[in-house]
Amino acid sequence: MGNIVRKLPIGIQSFDKLRTENYLYVDKTEFIYQMAYQGVPYFLSRPRRFGKSLLLSTFKAYFEGKKELFRGLAIEKLETEWKEHPVLHFSLNAELYDSRKALENMLERQLREWEKIYDTGGEGITYSGRFMTIIRRAAEITGRKVVVLIDEYDKPLLRNLHNEELQNEFRELLTAFYTVLKDADPWLRFVFITGVTKFAQVGIFSNLNHLNDISLAPQYAALCGMTLPEIEATFQPELHALAEANKLSYEDTIEKITRRYDGYHFDFRSGIALYNPFSVLNVLSKQVFYDYWFASGTPTFLAEMLRKTNYDIRELDGIEVSEVSLSDDRANINNPVPMIYQSGYLTIKSYDERFRLYTLGYPNEEVKYGFLNFVASMYAHLPETETPFYIGKFIQELESGNTEAFLTRLKAFFADIPYELNDRTERHYQVVFYIVFKLLGQFTEAEVRSAQGRADAIVKTPRYIVVFEFKLRGTAEEAIRQIDDRGYLIPYTADEREVVKVGVAFDAATRNLGEWLIEKTL
């Protein structure tokens, strides 16, 4: 195993700490200079753990004139003045926000800290009034315009997505607080606000009509995250050590990192593909391929949203959405797709410029299989740890040609669904079938029907091709006949592997698999 002695910035959100303690850094400072030069108020939406906090910390160091921290970086050759400005840096990331009082306490602590620095005497009755006084006083004392950096502005709202009463209270508080930024414009040099999603009802969007949303802007697509050239330029020793530890070639290592952690697209013109920085740094550090980003946070609010909307998750991979739905109100509980996209579980795959339609899909294997495994536990009401056990056994049985054992285990999987869920609709069971066969795709080639004229599911192993047809209202014999009559086997006539036909009938009374037939072709 390679001996890595360089420091990887896993979880480092302070640019000052990163530079003074010699952590590796993917240089984003050219973006910093460009945005600071423009000077307009910015908003950026990106998924969690994508580098938003470090980005704001970098802006803070830049506007505080800490030139020494930027030695050797792109901005060193661009900036000549290094003017120091008062910076109000505010993160809403650290609280649970389970009550109105929790948000009030957070605002109170932050305002008191600033009031002490700028000696305002706590002037102003409301939070917004005190915030305005702080901005004005900071500009007066220093003789320089103020920089405001707000990190994870939407955290209180995301924490309470399904608590309408608390949501409304938080909106009221935050709208009044953020609206100050419009009236304080004469004293402001730069404003940058980050979050996961865009709550259009909050005042920063309804009142700050000059806020520049760069979330889908091609020129800022690579502002957060890592590109492959950046990874290869910054982490060469770590990449070679990862290859050695996993007994892979350098090329195969890059291919595996790409397959598992690449694939994020935040615009439709630049073609820039981004790697998840959290997963990349972790795999380079631990030298083990694992779903680091997905394991670092469970998308419970998305699961709750899917439950409430009864959304068909089979439509997620390849769904088309309008440009407006991604750039307007993304926190619409009646349409979970924009929120799923903003949270990082879907990404842009293509864009139809004529009709202004985005096609979305899972960015990579980590997200695809992590999300499907999580949703499987939700639909089947099984612990998340049990689904991988089933999938592993399914694969072993199909690879050994024991289709009978596979179907018996699949029946047991359905039997484990609690009895109280047995009033689920037909679609519920179709979705469970879909999830199971999609999850098989982690380990072998598996397809689930997405169009007419194809079998319900096809699994290809080194020795077998297994073609499945399921009948919700019909017999196993009818399912086998449909495989033959519709020519589902024709694409495999020249294949040397053994082809197996499987017809399965669904038993409405037991809400489970009923009879099945297995036929092997000569």
Give, region by region, the residue ranges found by the protein language model.
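Phosphate-binding site recognition
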Residues: M1-T425, L440
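Mg2+/Mn2+-dependent nuclease catalytic core
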Residues: Q167-E172, L472-L489
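Metal-dependent nuclease catalytic cores in nucleic-acid-processing enzymes
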Residues: F177-A184, P338-L346, Y434-L439, Q482-V502
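Feature representing long, continuous alpha-helical segments
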Residues: T408, R427, V431-I435, R481
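Conserved catalytic cores of phosphodiester-cleaving nucleases, focusing on short active-site segments
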Residues: F433, A455-L472, R486
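A short acidic/basic microdomain associated with nuclease active sites
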Residues: Y434-S450
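C-terminal amphipathic alpha-helical interaction region
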Residues: E445-A451, A457-T461, Y492
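Domain-level recognition of nuclease-like catalytic cores that cleave nucleotide substrates
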Residues: P491, R497-L522
